């Protein structure tokens, strides 16, 4: 295994402290990250920087590396190397030096399997009106950069222009292939998953593919019938209130619900009878006339009966 000048790779001095080396690592990892850098050798440089950081960030590995680097030009280096305790070992133990510094993959770096990058999941808020048609959205997220120990060392901001298809539902997951973290040793990148969150609407409630809206009506509109303006996700419509309508009655408006690939839902107008404010003397007299005219009507006739 080639003994590389890790200090030169990191752009630091052998006398620099860990804080200085860590700062250099973060700067270089960001500079050569495959999702940021446009340089053709960015991926190779990124891995080289990560390899250097793996050694120089560990006090024991760094000390062993420094001793090896100091004796790299010694003719006896490949045959006999002096440990700090005066013990020596022969050339057949040479690979063990690298193993102690670089870990198990020192002698088997070429045999390491390709590893797929990590997936990233972010939540995307979508308004009900936006679900009717495909629309473009600019999303921003942080791409984690992992060090040689599998820990997140830093996060790189990333922005993508994406298309949100029509008919998306709450909790639906949209996959953007290869937009996760980079793979290792030639492995594929992870994916970015957009998790759709339908933002609550002030007027509409979602019931499957259908929508519900509460429509306030006056007592006389419910009794005599009326035409009232009701909003939908696209435009306002004129809704017919049949005579004798009751509070809580649901009136169906076909095709005004949510859109999906298979079908379009309906809109249900739920009637809410709203009483006028406390009546004045003249209005009270009119209500009394109505009560007298409907004296045989008992709204509680079947109340409590099975």
From Swiss-Prot:
Residues 5-69 form the J domain. Pfam families: DnaJ, DnaJ_C. The keyword Manganese does not apply. Keywords: Chaperone, Cytoplasm, DNA-binding. The keyword DNA-binding applies. PROSITE patterns: DNAJ_1, DNAJ_2. One of its GO terms (cellular component) is nucleoid. Gene3D superfamilies: DnaJ domain (1.10.287.110), Single helix bin (1.20.5.460), Urease metallochaperone UreE, N-terminal domain (2.60.260.20). InterPro entries: DNA-bd_curved-DNA, DnaJ_C, DnaJ_domain, DnaJ_domain_CS, HSP40/DnaJ_pept-bd, J_dom_sf. Coiled coil: none annotated. One of its GO terms (biological process) is protein refolding. It is found in: Cytoplasm, Nucleoid. GO terms for molecular function: bent DNA binding; unfolded protein binding. DNA-binding protein that preferentially recognizes a curved DNA sequence. It is probably a functional analog of DnaJ; displays overlapping activities with DnaJ, but functions under different conditions, probably acting as a molecular chaperone in an adaptive response to environmental stresses other than heat shock. Lacks autonomous chaperone activity; binds native substrates and targets them for recognition by DnaK. Its activity is inhibited by the binding of CbpM. NCBIfam families: PRK10266.1 (NF007618). HAMAP family: CbpA (MF_01154). This is Curved DNA-binding protein. It comes from Escherichia coli O17:K52:H18 (strain UMN026 / ExPEC). The gene is cbpA.
């Amino acid at each position: 295994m080639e003994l590389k000048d890790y200090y030169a790779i990191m752009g630091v001095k052998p006398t620099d402290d860990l804080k200085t080396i860590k700062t250099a690592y973060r700067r270089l990892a960001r500079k050569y990250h495959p999702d940021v850098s446009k340089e053709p050798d960015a991926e190779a440089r990124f891995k080289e920087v990560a390899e250097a950081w793996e050694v120089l960030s560990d006090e024991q590995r760094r000390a062993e590396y420094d001793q090896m680097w100091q004796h790299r030009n010694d003719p006896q280096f490949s045959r006999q190397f002096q440990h700090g305790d005066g013990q020596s070992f022969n050339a057949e133990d040479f690979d063990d030096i690298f193993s102690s510094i670089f870990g198990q993959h020192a002698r088997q770096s070429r045999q390491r399997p390709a590893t797929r990058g990590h997936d990233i999941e972010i939540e995307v808020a979508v308004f009900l009106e936006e679900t009717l048609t495909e629309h473009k959205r600019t999303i921003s997220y942080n791409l984690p950069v992992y060090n040689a120990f599998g820990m997140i060392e830093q996060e790189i901001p990333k922005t993508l222009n994406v298309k949100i298809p029509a008919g998306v539902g709450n909790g639906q997951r949209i996959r953007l292939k290869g937009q996760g973290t980079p793979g290792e040793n030639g492995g594929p990148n992870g994916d970015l998953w957009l998790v759709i969150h339908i933002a609550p609407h002030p007027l509409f409630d979602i019931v499957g593919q259908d929508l519900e809206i509460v429509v306030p009506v006056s007592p006389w509109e419910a009794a005599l019938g009326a035409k009232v303006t009701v909003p939908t996700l696209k435009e306002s419509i004129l809704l017919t209130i049949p005579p004798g309508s009751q509070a809580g009655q649901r009136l169906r408006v076909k095709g005004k619900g949510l859109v999906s690939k298979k079908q379009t839902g309906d809109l249900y107008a739920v009637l809410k009878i709203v009483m006028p404010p406390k009546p004045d003397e003249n209005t009270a007299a009119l209500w009394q006339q109505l009560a007298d005219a409907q004296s045989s009507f008992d709204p509680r006739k079947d109340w409590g009966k099975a």
